[in-house]
Amino acid sequence: MKIEEIKMIYIDEMIGQEVEMDEFSQMEATEEIAMKIEEKTLDMMEKDLEFMERYPNPTYAVLRLSYLVGSEDMENWKKLQEMYEEKTLLNHLKEIQNQAVDFIKREKVKMMKAQGLTEKMKRENPEEYQGQMNNLMATVKRMAIKEYVEA
């Protein structure tokens, strides 16, 4: 059975249980519902001025939303739909953003120390320092994505 068929069965079950889904009742495809959830959630995120001021580019929140929307895993689909219906999706995404950014800050310091990236190195060999910092940041960001976005 294809994931689309499984998702439609799940949606049919939810409708059968009289779960509030009025806004999706005219939609036929699961993908259409997922895209609508994504669109509405991004709109709500943009309206949260405090959050947007703190994170003008909420990369990890948006990546997490995209991950849940595009996931082939039935558990992720259920999680997305339940959080949306319970109105906890936006808070979940904001928390993912906070956790990922905090993780990056902590790990960056640890990894800089472990790799010997010091102010002295920055002054004496700026090109080497910059290259190593670029690699370090790419690694830390990949770690954050694995730990928080794809968890």
For each feature predicted by the language model, list its residue ranges:
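Short amphipathic alpha-helical coiled-coil/interface segments
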Residues: 33-48, 97-104, 133-137
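Aromatic-enriched hydrophobic runs in primary sequence
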Residues: 38, 92, 147-150
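Active-site helix-to-loop segments that bind/position phosphate- or nucleotide-bearing substrates
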Residues: 85-122, 139
